Structures are given as structure tokens and as C-alpha cells.
């Protein structure tokens, strides 16, 4: 553990179109090489496609997708007397959100549509309907935690 003081959380401003902090975090995670305007175009473009296909408010689809992806428990490695156990632990709310965003973007990047807008909109729609590889990742994480429930008394 570091003896220095904790790093301060940076203030982030809500996005200009929806006024939502989570959308800003999502944009920042999509952004590559500091190109925020490109990330904005991708996210807003995907939201437009979602609105066209789902006939729903894109923000509600986005939040339901994140909620369906976010894990409740995960496993952490804990070394006890020469053996390493995978110990299931509850996930803090900030980490839940961060993991959901990360997994959603990773799943979208792996898809095989032509543009990132199409990939992201497809993954958002799938995740909001409890399908897609990001939701599968959460299910696998929950299965791992369930399989290792016997080691839950090693929590710290």
C-alpha cells in the first residue's frame, strides 16, 4: 500500500447533449489519443442509431445496458499458505460502473460491423435486451464467483 496521499478524483463535466455524467465517462473511455470530438461523434451517432432502431430514448437504453452488464460479485486472488484461492467479493458501485463501461466498449470493438457507430449501437441494443458478449462476460464472472463460494470466508 502506498504511503502517499490518495489521488484526488477529478471533476468531470456532464456531456453537452444529455447532461449526463455517465455518458461523459463513457465518451472518455471510448476516446483514443485524446480525440474527444471523434469519441463524441461515435457515441452520439450510436445513440441516434439506437433511437432509430429501438424507438426508445437512447439514454434509457444506455443505462439499462450498463445495468445489465455491471457485475455484482467478482473473484479476487487471495494467497493463503502457499495456495492461491479465487475469493468472491462484492463489487463497489464505482467499480461496477467502470467495469460495465469497459466491458461494453471491449465487446463493441470485437464486433464485426464496419463502423464503430454500428458496433456500439448493436452492442447497446443487445446489452439492453440481456444479450451480447458484454452480458456474457458478466454471467461468466458471476459463475466464477458462484463456483468459488466455498472460499468466501477468506474475504478481507
Swiss-Prot record:
Pfam name, any one: Ribosomal_S7
Entry-linked PROSITE patterns: RIBOSOMAL_S7
Keywords: Ribonucleoprotein, Ribosomal protein, RNA-binding, rRNA-binding, tRNA-binding
GO molecular function: rRNA binding; structural constituent of ribosome; tRNA binding
PANTHER family: RIBOSOMAL PROTEIN S7 (PTHR11205)
Gene3D superfamilies, per the entry: Ribosomal protein S7 domain
HAMAP family noted in UniProt: Ribosomal_uS7_B (MF_00480_B)
Name of the featured protein: Small ribosomal subunit protein uS7
CDD domains: uS7_Bacteria
Known partners and oligomeric status: Part of the 30S ribosomal subunit. Contacts proteins S9 and S11.
Amino acid at each position: 500500500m502506498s504511503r502517499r496521499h490518495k489521488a484526488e478524483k477529478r471533476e468531470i463535466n456532464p456531456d453537452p447533449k444529455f447532461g449526463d455524467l455517465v455518458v461523459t465517462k463513457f465518451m472518455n473511455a471510448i476516446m483514443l489519443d485524446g480525440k474527444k470530438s471523434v469519441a463524441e461523434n461515435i457515441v452520439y451517432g450510436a445513440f441516434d442509431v439506437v433511437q432509430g432502431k429501438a424507438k426508445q430514448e437512447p439514454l434509457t437504453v444506455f443505462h439499462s445496458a450498463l445495468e445489465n452488464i455491471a457485475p455484482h460479485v467478482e473473484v479476487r486472488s487471495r494467497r493463503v499458505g502457499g495456495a492461491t484461492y479465487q475469493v468472491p467479493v462484492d463489487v463497489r458501485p464505482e467499480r461496477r460502473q467502470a467495469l460495465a463501461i469497459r466491458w461494453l466498449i471491449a465487446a463493441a470493438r470485437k464486433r464485426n460491423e464496419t463502423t464503430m457507430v454500428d458496433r456500439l449501437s448493436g452492442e447497446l441494443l443487445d446489452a439492453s435486451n440481456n444479450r451480447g458478449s458484454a452480458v456474457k462476460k458478466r454471467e461468466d464472472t458471476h459463475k466464477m464467483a458462484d463456483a468459488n463460494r466455498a472460499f468466501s470466508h477468506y474475504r478481507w
